[in-house]
């Protein structure tokens, strides 16, 4: 029959609603037949078979009666009214099954409302894809038939009958589908999704055969559910917007796989337990211990190169997570300190400012104005210490710093009678007085030389140098002259450094104190820096040509870093021009001098004192300063490659020992930062806890596994380098006495072979800690370090350690006791030092050369070339192949002082059988 075929054809749309394609022009009647049957069967399976059949018969009778009664009225209506009537009946039937049964007889009333429905359906199209496509299907199918066929009574009655039957059956089917979903346990929120999944299964066959058609309006589904479950119809609107279109469900789980894929890419670059933000991880991420074997295969030696060092920004700010830490402005934007003002607004004078600052002596508890503390402060104090003193309002007197040494000296006369000691002292003074008088008499005959000799004897007795012009004495003497030597009381020898000699004096270049010196890894270059804001590079004579060729190679190729600073270009050009000269212009008398007398190059750019230096394995150099910046240099370039800005003074820096694309910086702002040089950013950072957050030292240990920092209050804090998380800490202090309060940490040096670290502090102590249990392995005493940034370091074979001192001596200890020299000694205490006196000011830095054979070969070969007299050293050279001398018993030592003098020592120990 025509009505049945029309109903079957129109019923194709509800099942095809989920296909989402464009609808065809032709009639999908064949497909609609199978679809209607599937929907009907699905509804019957739920268990409501009988009520549906009865509902069909009742509704059909009422439809026929209403059609006969109103047939004349229907003929007078417009075609579009008939078209919209089907939609009104569908909405009425969906809203309430009772209305669908009783109100169908009132067709004229329904037709009056049909004019509003198309506009409302158009609004629904923009809200939901399902609603839009279903509405289009309901509009188009009846209107197409109406336009193509002539309008007659029979056709319109048939269309009305089929449309009404369709709406009723559609409502019944949707109710049954919803009930089936409810039986399966869906809640209010999950019902729309369950209905979607159910329709997907029911119409699988249609999706395979039928062409793609637009989905239809699904607004009736939530309304029916709401009307059957709750009498209040206020809830249905939210569910109407809740169910998402069918296409999104497959796309909703799609994003998680993409995220997991990106995370897996990052996981391949780090260990699984690293908890680092993804923005901090790059393709060239920091090597970890677990990645060592894999990275060795891919990139045997990850290192920094000039291309990556010069790429990107020239000035990098210390921004963590995209913003300046703690909301502070970056260093380049920080305004200079404002001069304090009085209550009336007048600027205070320098005297008023100094008088207003009260500082406290930590040893005595005395508080004095800063203006009166100058005479009580230790001589040679550095500007960093003064800055910390102003911030902490604390200081340590020079006498208190030597308190333990005084106790040691006071313990000496306890073994002897006080009267006898006084008597010996008086006799010594009388003897010295006679010696001085005799020297005056000899001066008339032999001149000033005898006086200087007597003065040197006096200084050796008293270990003092008041008004002693020893520097002028040294200038007129050969560099092979032995220096003053002293040893600890009770240390009777044999000594290892009593025959040490000065072989070169590099004074006259630095204008002011030298705060730090560092050798390159190969031992051929020495970097020194300090108070004059300039970094100087000293090259060995036998390595000058190599580095000069390297520099000329880059200059001739025109490989200049982009936008170098003008002050760096101008200054370095003049400096390097004077330094670029042949190695034959040196003084022929300085045959034993290992370094060229003038610096290989000078790097200018810092605007305040330099505090620390660090070399990479391929000749990159980092310098940190009190101007709150870290600058990157390379030995082949004249200009600064990059500038890393900080918030406060940068007290310590260190290249990562295994991957020099990263470096560590410690600052007085309390933050430890791990910088990525190629990416020009802070890769990781952490902040020190506690009241005093001043970081005064930093380094790596265990071959880069841990980063260690030292603080002003005497703590050594360890961080896991992989993600810079806190690991453990050591409180560096004595158990009793004056040093039970932690003092400033000035240096941290690893002892690679034995898993230990060497810690220098301002309590005039050097401590060796075992990292396996954080126990104290050895404590070294004897030197004076109460307020300086003096730090101790190891010799090339870790047999000795050396440190400068505020008493103008260089102190050397054996790392471990030679038990053959002592009958009874504490294994965890080392008071047996050897001292060298070669400076007339505070020795601010002292280091061993990492490769002394490079320097000794020059010395020995020059002696061999003379051929006049063969020394024992030359005989040793003959016994060794390729002209390289054995260095097992030889050390090269360098020291710098508060006046800028740098001296080079060579020590050749006696052969021990």
From Swiss-Prot:
Biased segments, Polar residues type: 280-311
One Pfam family matching this protein: WD40
Presence of the UniProt keyword Coiled coil in the record: yes
Motif (FFAT-like motif) on chain: 9-15
SMART domains listed in its UniProt record: WD40 (SM00320)
Post-translational modification: Phosphorylated by ATK1; the phosphorylation stabilizes its interaction with RAB11A and RAB11B.
Ranges of the WD repeats in the UniProt entry: 509-548, 605-643, 645-685, 690-729, 740-779, 784-823, 876-913
Biological process per Gene Ontology, one example term: negative regulation of cilium assembly
Region (Disordered): 1-24, 205-348, 397-424, 459-480, 557-593
Important for interaction with ARHGAP26 AND ARHGAP10: annotated span: 211-257
Mutation effect (residue 344 to D): Phosphomimetic mutant. No ciliogenesis induction in serum-starved conditions
Region (Important for interaction with RAB11A): 334-347
Positions in coiled-coil regions: 119-184
Assembly and binders: Interacts with the GTP-bound form of RAB11A and RAB11B. Interacts with GRAF1/ARHGAP26 or GRAF2/ARHGAP10; the interaction connects the endoplasmic reticulum (ER) with the endosomal tubule. Interacts (via FFAT-like motif) with VAPA (via MSP domain) or VAPB (via MSP domain); the interaction connects the ER with the endosomal tubule. Does not bind to RAB7, RAB10, RAB14, RAB35 and RAB8A.
Designated name of the protein: WD repeat-containing protein 44
Organism of this sequence: Homo sapiens (Human)
